[in-house]
From Swiss-Prot:
This is Outer membrane protein A. Residues 1-38 form the signal peptide. The keyword Ion transport does not apply. GO terms for cellular component: cell outer membrane; cell surface; extracellular region; periplasmic space. InterPro entries: Autotransporte_beta (IPR005546), Autotransporte_beta_dom_sf (IPR036709), OM_autotransptr_brl_dom (IPR006315). The lineage of its organism: Bacteria, Pseudomonadati, Pseudomonadota, Alphaproteobacteria, Rickettsiales. Residues 1734-2021 form the Autotransporter domain. Belongs to the rickettsiae OmpA/OmpB family. Changing M1877I: In strain: Indian tick typhus.
Length: 2021
């Protein structure tokens, strides 16, 4: 079945249904009129405006016919179950209660509306174009039940559930109702907006495409069983209720905002679905408050939920782009899940929030974002890529055991955010990766942390049962502490881990457990009962000097665990008591090991400065090692000592000192720079069977020949020199192998004393003296493993068994070498005999094959084989003759290195390997005297001088051969039999050199591929090519003649001969002196390869025929062609069965086409008729590749004909290219035979090429592409191919259709289509943008035209089928017929720009033209548009213009004919319009600029959109029925869109029954409204120019953007006036039920607005208030809140912060002074105790840096804040007497304050300079004291306050108001205390005091905003506080240090703390803005802890203080350093 458009098919069905309905209706009418049916039509038609259902028979209704028209018979209003039709543009009132209307037909009218005055049911509503507005009266309902209607019964047909005619619906009151249901049921779709305060009830699947409640929110939207799809951007209803278990609510708009709550009112939880499918969806109220929903589904986009209650079984994020944001504190009851792809979806909490269920259970979310506030997560599963704490006040608490899959991060300021675990918990990801958290708190239970990064100021274990386990390698940045009871808490590391801070600083932990991995501990204090290494891989590193209090033990398997010390360190307990450690590592410094037990596999010295000393005779169990830089570290033994393990195994120690006595080293490895024998009695014995001593052994006594070295092991080794300073007495090698690595060996004798004795020199060595065998003959082994020299003989007394030469060169200077075998054992082994030598024995390679070098430097003899076991790498023969007598010679290469080099093989021999000349070229002689085999190449590097093959000798060459001469003796044979490679592939072998005596020689080719390169190959008498072998004769060096007294035998059917010119510098020739005979029928292969430059195959005698194969007998099976090959006509190829032209070949032959089969691969085969006409069989030509080319060519100077005997047909479509090349201009190539190019299968391309002519009559072309690469003219008939131009000069005349595309291909050719010639494919211009001309000489159908320079049409009707973006330089009319343009034809180009006739244009369905359409000289004809059509430049026409759809003109429009605007069309003009006439019935005209409209115009139901533009009208115009004017009234300009009727013109509106004026008011500034703020819509220059409609027919709608401005309209003059209504709007907003009635601080906000409203015009206050008019009420309230001042100012915050700073820093200093004063007084009564050496110091200076923060939560609607303070205090004080101290201090503090809640965005920065005087008086010899502090604070405050402004209607932005002012404060504090001395050195000090403060704020004015800069007056106020508390402290003496920890608590009661109101106002306000105030808490609590360490004159302290009040928390940490002098 043919493809049918779905739309076409639908239209056909509709037309069929209409025809059937018409037939049925007609029959029914006929039967009815005849009385056959006996029924009347149940429908009526309204005939007058204001008709009502209750009308009796009168003038408002007529009976209706089945055809849908009035029959003239008056009727009653529609009855129950009737239908009715609008007969005009009427208002109809449904005023009969409970009436059921089957259907309503709007028909072709523009109805004013349907008023529902009584409960009414309406079935379907259909229309002919316009929509029916409906208004439902308060308390009444409209039910849509979806009934259908049929023409026979109702006068029109309407399908069920069809409301395409229903427009906007207005609900007239709170209980006006719209009910949507369907009897079917089926889906009902409503297109219009629904407004009003009523109720919508949906009982079926329904879609509401418009907005709901946009102007006036609905009371309720009820969703019953079904899917309610709300597609509008605005849905406003108090509650949207899901009333049925099957209820589904879907919001689809990209920016949907549902204002109100969504609830499940079924009474059953967990039913009902909410789908939020838009990119930005918003629900402002609670969800599921009454009963939980089943699902909230968030699609691709962000859902913003503003309710405090969200209840649903699951809130699902279903898409990668899903996100949900809770904008307020919320309780989410249920789970939040990602049901899309893993690691997508974002959940954001912006206040204190709770989620009761799991998060990300199905798939992990991308992000959980926690803003300012605490997120309490109760689920057992939390899965998200990252849980982010984004604010200083962010906190997350997991209230149950939980698995948190993903990371937890602080993305706000560093060291903020709290994470609390209250049960067994797991976190899989990092914590604090971006910025560190403040605290990780672990309660009772185990916290399992899996991240690699844990960053928090402190990780606190707060309970006896607290435990934290790090399951992966981790870096813990911060401290780990036990803040519970001492010796509790467990920390477990299970991977490589780092802790940067102390562990157990507050209280010791029970256990630090180090599992598999390294624990790097950076603290100076590590306190734990036991530090346990529990795993084989456990390790702990102390990175700083440390005191480890407690034991270190290995509780795992023995000999595991590592302990590392990196400074002077002390361990108080045992090490390895339970099980030995693997390693004790000692870094830079001295390790003092205090335990009674030291057990470790290895004690490692890791640093240059490492040292360990064993002071007594010791047995060290384990090894001692240096793992630092080599040759560092000292171990000292001072008596008889034993070490059971190795010493210096990793790196050598610097020194091992052996004193008097025997040092028995049992380890296999001893490494030290020097092992020193320091005493005459020193003896060093290595007992290990495999002892290796790395380093030197020296005698440092100063006396030669003392000291003994015994190498008693089976394998002993010394790597360094022996006896370098003073010689040893003896080196004795017993039964075993001694390996000596030194370069100096000094001993009288190195003796091999045993049959099993062996000595190995492992490094280059000079052995001065002999090496001898003093035992039995043929025993003893000497091994050299580096470059070595032996100056004497080897084996002189008795022959050695073996001399082994390892890696390196052994130089033997002696003339006698006796050894059973000299073994070359290594790849780098080499032996050089430096003098003539007789080697008695064999030379062998016992290492890897093809390694080892033997060099002879004079006449030499070897009696045995060489390389018998494995081939050597090289036998090198220098100047002289090497006589080799062995039958086996194996070496990779035997090299002749000198001009005088020669080698003679004296016996038949197998030479395994190559023979090569590595000296000068053409030197060296090789002689074979018997049948010989050489497995490798001969002469590979350089050609040899001569290769002699003796008489009768057969030389088998296993490789290539290259010699200057190859001399054959009589009856000699050279056979090449080289193997394949390891993969079974042929290796190309070569045969190079001049052949002497070749006439007697035989060449056997028994290798797969052999190439001969010398022209003398033609002299060899016989060449035999073996089975499966290929022999090549290459002419690269010059021309070659073959077959001259020469036999070439193909010994098998698969033997092959190659004739080639692979590397020749030009085209070379291979000439045949005779026929080349095939071995049999279809046997043998011949290959021609032209190589780089080409090969000619011809006869050695010109004109003498030579045959390749026998035409009538034995033919060669295959001829293969490679590269460029030309066969001369002398050589006949008919003796070839198959010709294969391979890839990239260029084969030319005029004889090959008679071969059996010709197969063309990706190559070219040229048949040239240059010598005459040709008859080509053609059927034997095969295209084996899609790009195979066949060239039929005439390159002669004559006309030629090529006659085809058969079709040229590829095997598959789109394969093969045929090029027809007529080379010579004026000459012709004729293709005869009447055959087809591309028969059953089409060719890929047919190319016409050349400068000559073509004759193709009778020839058919079946191809994909026809390419025109010609310079002349060509005429083609019908073709299915694509046609492509390749030359600018192409001139193609197409006489038949083109079935493919036509491509100008960036060429400026011309293609002419004859009449009725069509192009089925695209006309395009690949690679170009403005090339080529297409001329259509008559009618034509074109598919798509794009990219060409010119299209000429018009001689006949032309249709272009496809549109889209089209570039045509110009379309020109060649006649006045029609050019039909397809849908969406978007032309970049012009029409009739440079010429052309009046071509008619028909835009079928939209499009555009970028250039001019016609000019004054070259106008176009008729213009018809439909769809969206636009013209970017001027339009000039002289026909009839019919404009439909949406048509826009960006430039002038001129038409000398009539213009008709189609019904429902929209036409937009941007510049002047000129026409004869306009008809605009039911059409819209938009004016985009002020312009002149010059034309008569008539219209009915016309809409004119003026905007703010003036239309100057010239002509005669009249409008009837409805006229709609859309205008814009610009308040700033005090003008708007209007029509000015020019003098002499008229505009008649008297026939307009409804003048609808729609005004959009913009830029209305209340400051500029005056009596002249008005404008007139239509005016005339002369009287009578305007004929108005009666004023009662004028209806005005005003769209206003400023809530504080309203308008009035004078219908008689069409004039609009503006007025200020702000006062009333404010009252309504705050009245009961108003949007701002119940907001926080409502009274203050209202008062603020009233003050601003009362300000004078032009003032800042009035300007800001005007801007608020663009906001919604809630936005307005927020903006006002940001202006109003809270009672708590930055100065109040600073006062609190500064009081805490002073109290903490100075008071702590006074505490220390009090302690010193007590000692001074005590010292006056008795002696000074230890640690009190500073008693004479009377003065002190101190410094105390500090950091702190404070948080105030929101209180009584007053915004909270967060402050951060840093700074420092310096002070100086002194004793005035023993009882009185006075001091002064200076404090600098910098504080950042960030406000929250209503003031979010406000920030303050404060610089404080505080100057203090302080004093302490202690009653002599009593415990009573009094302290006093007086302070002055100078504060510079910079504030940045957010101001809210309206940027557009109901859209806000922000500006920043900047303030800069000073605040001063004066504070005095007096405190008294009494110290009680308690047991155990504990002091208890009760304290009581008073504090008084005065604060003075300076006045200032803000800058930075447009109208919202406040002027703030200064204020003064006082505070008075009482203080009561206690302090506990104790002095602890630790050596010379006195530690004083203290804890204090204080109650602060404010007797006076009331803060005065703030006077802040905008310019123009007569009174200040109200101040938001609350009653501040009276009571707060101060708690602090600190510790002071005193050492002599220095004191060091650290303190932590907190201040806690109602919703207030502040904390400060400080350190202090004090020096007393």
């Amino acid at each position: 079945m043919a493809n049918i458009s779905p739309k076409l098919f639908q239209k056909a069905i509709q037309q069929g249904l209409k025809a059937a309905l018409f037939t049925t209706s007609t029959a029914a009418i006929m039967l009815s009129s005849s009385g056959a049916l006996g029924i009347a039509v149940s429908g009526v038609i309204a005939t007058n405006n204001n008709a009502a259902f209750s009308d009796n028979v009168g003038n408002n209704w007529n009976e209706i016919t089945a055809a849908g028209v009035a029959n003239g018979t008056p009727a009653r209003g529609p009855q129950n179950n009737w239908a009715f039709t609008y007969g005009g543009d009427y208002t109809i009132t449904a005023d009969v209660a409970d009436h059921i209307i089957t259907a309503i037909n709007v028909a072709d009218t523009t109805p004013i509306g349907l008023n529902i005055a009584q409960n009414t049911v309406v079935g379907s509503i259909v229309t002919g174009g316009n929509l029916l507005p409906v208004t439902i009266t308060a308390g009444k309902s409209l039910t849509l039940n979806g009934n259908n209607a049929d023409a026979a019964n109702h006068g029109f047909g309407a399908p069920a559930d069809n409301y395409t005619g229903l427009g906007n619906i207005a609900l007239g009151g709170a209980n006006a109702a719209l009910i949507i249901q369907s009897a079917a049921p089926a889906k009902i779709t409503l297109a219009g907006n629904i407004n009003g305060g009523g109720i919508i009830t949906v009982k079926t699947d329904a879609a509401i495409n418009g907005t709901i409640g946009n102007t006036n929110a609905l009371a309720t939207v009820n969703v019953g069983a079904g899917i309610a799809t709300l597609e509008g951007a605005i849905i406003k209803a108090t509650t949207t209720k899901l009333t049925n278990a099957a209820s589904v609510l879907t919001l689809t708009n990209v920016n949907a905002v549902l204002t109100g709550a969504i609830d499940n009112t079924t009474g059953v939880d967990n039913v009902g679905v909410l789908n939020l499918n838009g990119a930005l969806s918003q629900v402002t109220g609670n969800i599921g408050n009454t009963n939980a929903l089943a699902t909230i589904s968030v699609g691709a986009g962000k859902a913003t939920l503003g309710g405090a209650v969200i209840k649903a079984t699951t809130t699902k994020l279903t898409d990668n782009a899903s996100a949900v944001t809770f904008t307020n504190p919320v309780v989410v009851t249920g789970a939040i899940d990602n049901t899309g792809n893993a690691n997508n979806g974002i959940v954001t909490f912006t206040g204190d929030s709770t989620v009761t269920g799991n998060i990300g259970n199905t798939n992990a979310l991308a992000t959980i974002s926690v803003g300012a506030g605490k997120a309490t997560l109760g689920g057992a599963i939390i899965k998200a890529t990252t849980t982010k704490l984004t604010d200083n006040a962010s906190a997350v608490t997991f209230t149950n055991p939980v698995v948190v899959t993903g990371a937890i991060d602080n993305t706000g300021n560093a060291n903020n955010g709290i994470v609390t675990f209250t049960g067994d918990s797991t976190v899989t990801g990092n914590i604090g990766n971006t910025n560190a958290l403040a605290t990780i708190s672990v309660g009772a239970g185990k916290a399992t942390l899996g991240g690699a990064i844990i960053k928090a100021t402190t990780t606190k274990l707060t309970d006896n049962a607290s435990a934290v386990t790090f399951t992966n390698p981790v870096v813990v940045t911060g401290a780990i502490d036990n803040t519970g009871n001492a010796n509790n808490g467990i920390v477990t590391f299970t991977g490589d881990s780092t802790v940067t801070g102390n562990i157990g600083n507050t209280n010791a932990l029970a256990t630090i457990s180090v599992g598999a991995g390294k624990a790097t501990l950076g603290g100076a204090i590590i306190k734990a009962t036991t530090t346990k290494l529990t795993d084989n891989a456990s390790a702990v590193t102390f990175t700083n000097p440390v005191v480890v209090t407690g034991a270190i033990d290995n509780t795992g398997n023995a000999n595991n665990g590592i302990v590392t010390f990196t400074g002077d360190s002390t361990v108080t307990g045992n090490i390895g008591n339970t099980n030995a450690l693997a390693t004790i590592s000692v870094g830079a410094g001295k390790a003092t090991l205090g335990g009674a037990i030291i057990k470790a596999t290895t004690t490692k010295l890791t640093d240059n400065a490492s040292a360990v000393t064993f002071t007594n005779p010791v047995v060290v169990t384990g090894a001692i090692d240096n793992t630092g830089n080599a040759n560092n570290g000292i171990v000292t033994f001072t008596g008889n000592s034993t070490v059971t393990g190795n010493i210096g195994n990793t790196n050598a120690l610097a020194t091992v000192n052996v004193g008097a006595g025997i040092a028995t080293l049992e380890g296999a490895v001893i490494k030290a720079t020097t092992t020193k024998l320091t005493n005459a009695a020193s003896v060093l014995t290595l007992t290990n069977v495999n002892a290796v001593l790395t380093g030197a052994i020296d005698n440092t006594t100063g006396v030669d020949n003392v000291g003994v070295l015994n190498l008693n092991g089976a394998l002993s080794q010394v790597t360094g020199n022996i006896g370098n300073t003073n010689a040893l007495a003896t080196i004795s090698v017993g039964a075993g192998k001694a390996t000596l690595g030194g370069a100096v060996i000094k001993a009288t004798t190195t003796k091999l004393t045993d049959n099993a004795s062996a000595v190995t020199f492992t490094n280059p060595v000079v052995v001065t003296g002999a090496i001898d065998n003093t035992g039995n003959a043929n025993n003893g082994i000497a091994t050299f493993t580096g470059d070595s020299t032996v100056t004497g003989n080897i084996g002189n007394t008795n022959a050695l068994a073996t001399v082994n030469v390892g890696a390196g060169l052994l130089r033997v200077q002696g003339g006698v070498v006796k050894s059973n075998t000299i073994n070359l054992t290594d790849n780098a082994s080499a032996v050089t005999f430096t003098n003539p030598v007789v080697v008695t024995g064999a030379i062998d390679n016992t290492g890897n094959a093809n390694n080892g070098i033997v060099t002879f430097t004079g006449d030499s003899t070897v009696t045995g084989n060489i390389g018998n076991t494995n081939a050597l790498a090289t036998i090198s023969v220098g100047a002289g003759k090497a006589t080799l007598g062995g039958a086996i010679i194996k070496a990779t290469t035997t090299k002749l290195t000198d001009n005088a080099s020669a080698v003679t093989f004296t016996n038949p021999v197998v030479v395994t390997g190559a023979i090569d000349n590595t000296g000068n070229a053409n030197n060296g002689i090789v002689t074979f005297t018997g049948d010989s085999t050489v497995t490798g190449n001969i002469g590979n590097t350089n050609a040899l001088a001569t290769v002699n093959v003796g008489a009768g000798v057969t030389l088998q060459a296993g490789g290539s051969l290259d010699a200057n001469n190859i001399d054959f003796g009589a009856r000699s044979t050279l056979e090449f039999n080289g193997p394949l490679d390891g993969g079974g592939n042929a290796i190309p072998y070569y045969f190079k050199g001049a052949i002497a005596n070749g006439n007697n020689a035989i060449l056997n080719v028994n290798t797969k591929l052999l190439t001969a390169y010398h022209l003398t190959i033609g002299t060899v008498a016989e060449i035999n090519i073996g089975a499966g072998n290929l022999f090549a004769i290459d002419a690269s060096a010059g021309d070659v003649t073959i077959l001259n007294a020469q036999d070439i035998h193909f010994r098998a059917l698969d033997s092959a001969l190659v004739l080639s010119n692979l590397t020749g510098v030009g085209v070379n020739n291979i000439l045949l002196a005779a026929d080349l005979v095939a071995p049999g029928v279809d046997e043998g292969t011949v290959v021609f390869d032209g190589g780089v430059n080409g090969l000619n195959i011809g006869s050695n005698v010109a004109g003498a025929a030579r045959n390749i194969g026998d035409v009538g007998g034995n033919k060669f099976n295959t001829l293969l062609i490679y590269n460029a090959v030309t066969i001369t006509d002398d050589v006949n190829l008919e003796g070839i069965q198959n010709v294969l032209i391979n890839n990239n070949a260029d084969f030319t032959s005029s004889t090959a086409f008679n071969a059996g089969t010709i197969q063309i691969n990706d190559a070219t085969y040229t048949i040239d008729a240059n010598n005459g006409n040709l008859n080509i069989p053609a059927g034997n030509i095969k295209f084996a590749h899609a790009d195979a080319q066949l060239i039929l060519q005439n390159s002669s100077g004559n006309d030629r004909t090529i006659t085809l005997g058969a079709n040229i047909d590829p095997d598959n479509d789109d394969e093969g290219i045929v090029i027809l090349n007529s080379v010579t201009a004026g000459k012709k190539l004729t293709i005869a035979g009447g055959k087809t190019f591309g028969g059953a299968h089409k060719l890929q391309d047919i190319v016409f090429k050349g400068e000559g002519d073509f004759g193709t009559a009778g020839t058919t072309f079946n191809t994909t592409n026809i390419v025109l690469d010609i310079t002349g003219q060509l005429e083609l008939g019908a073709t299915t191919a694509n046609v492509v131009l390749f030359k600018d000069a192409v001139q193609l005349t197409q006489t038949g259709n083109i079935g493919g595309f036509l491509d100008f291909n960036a060429k400026n050719g011309t293609v002419t289509l004859n009449n009725n010639v069509n192009v089925a494919g695209t006309v395009k211009n690949t690679g170009g943008t403005n090339n080529g001309t297409l001329i259509v000489l008559g009618a034509s159908n074109l598919n798509r035209v794009n990219g060409i320079a010119m299209l000429k049409v018009g001689a006949g009707n032309v249709t272009i089928a496809k549109g889209g973006n089209v570039k045509i330089g110009e379309i020109q009319g060649t006649g006045t017929n029609t050019l039909t343009l397809p849908a969406h034809f978007k032309l970049t180009g012009s029409i009739n720009k440079t010429g052309g006739q009046a071509l008619k244009l028909n835009f079928m369905n939209g499009g555009s033209v970028s250039g001019v359409v016609g000019t004054a000289a070259n106008s176009v004809g008729d213009i018809t548009t439909a769809g969206a059509t636009s013209f970017a430049s001027s339009v000039n026409a002289k026909g009839t213009a019919t404009l439909g759809g949406t048509t826009s003109f960006a430039h002038t429009f001129t038409n000398t004919g009539a213009v008709t605007l189609a019904k429902g069309s929209i036409t937009s003009f941007a510049k002047n319009v000129t026409a004869t006439s306009f008809v605009a019935n039911s059409a819209t005209i938009n004016f985009g600029n002020s312009l002149a409209f010059n034309s008569n115009i008539t219209g009915s139901g016309t809409t004119l959109t003026l905007g703010a533009n003036q239309v100057t009208y010239t002509g005669t115009g009249s409008f009837t029925d409805t006229l709609t004017l859309n205008t814009t009234f610009d308040g700033a300009a005090k003008s708007g869109g209007n029509i000015l009727i020019k003098s002499g013109s008229t505009l008649d509106l008297s026939g307009v029954s409804n003048l609808a004026l729609v005004v959009t008011a913009t830029n209305f500034d209340m400051n500029n409204i005056s009596p002249d703020t008005k404008y007139t819509v239509i005016s005339a220059e002369t009287a009578g120019g305007l004929k108005p409609t009666p004023k009662e027919n004028v209806k005005i709608t005003i769209n206003n953007d400023n809530r504080f401005v309203d308008f009035t309209f004078d219908a008689s003059t069409l004039t609009l006036f503006a007025e200020d209504i702000a006062a009333g709007v404010i009252d309504e907003d705050f009245a009961p039920g108003g949007p701002l009635a119940n907001i926080p601080n409502a009274a203050n906000i209202k008062k603020s607005l009233e003050l601003m409203e009362d300000a004078p015009n032009g003032s800042d206050a009035r300007q800001a208030f005007n801007n608020f008019g663009l906001m919604t009420p809630l936005q307005e309230a927020d903006a006002t809140t940001h202006l109003m001042q809270d009672v708590v100012k930055p100065s109040d915050t600073i006062a609190a912060v500064n009081n805490q700073v002073v109290a903490s820093n100075i008071s702590s200093n006074i505490t220390a002074l009090n302690a010193r004063m007590d000692k001074v007084q005590a010292g006056n009564k008795g002696p000074v105790s230890s640690g009190d050496e500073d008693m004479d110091a009377k003065f002190g200076a101190w410094i105390s840096p500090f950091v702190g923060n404070a948080t105030q939560k929101m209180c009584n609607s007053i915004s909270g804040y967060k402050s951060d303070t840093t700074g420092g205090t310096i002070g100086f004080d002194g004793f005035v007497s023993d009882d009185l101290v006075l001091g002064l201090a200076y404090t600098r503090a910098d504080t950042d304050i960030k406000l929250k809640n209503n003031k979010t965005g406000d920030k303050n920065k404060v610089e404080s300079n505080i100057y203090s005087l302080y004093g302490l008086y202690s009653v002599p010899y009593e415990n009573l004291f009094v302290e006093a502090i007086a302070s002055y604070s100078d504060n510079k405050i910079r504030s940045k306050s957010r101001r809210v402004i309206a940027t557009t209607l109901e859209t806000v932005g922000y500006q920043t108001a900047n303030g800069k002012y000073k605040s001063e404060s004066y504070t005095g504090q007096l405190m008294a205390g009494y110290t009680y001395m308690m047991s155990e050195n504990i002091n208890l000090t009760p304290l009581a005091g008073l504090r008084y403060s005065t604060i003075k704020d300076k006045s200032y004015k803000e800058t930075g905003t447009t109208y919202q800069n406040l002027t703030v007056k200064g204020k003064n106020y006082n505070t008075f506080d009482g203080l009561l508390g206690a302090k506990v402290s104790s002095n602890i003496n630790v050596n010379e240090i006195v530690l004083t920890p203290e804890l204090y608590a204080m109650v602060d009661y404010a007797f006076k703390n009331k803060v005065s109101a703030i006077d802040a106002r905008l310019q123009g306000m007569t009174a200040p803005l109200p101040t938001n105030s609350f009653k501040q808490s009276k009571t707060s609590f101060d708690v602090g802890v600190g510790v002071t360490a005193k050492h002599k004159m220095m004191e060091y302290g650290i303190n932590y203080d907190t201040n806690i009040g109602s919703k207030y928390f502040a904390q400060q940490g400080s350190v202090k350093v004090r020096v007393n002098f």
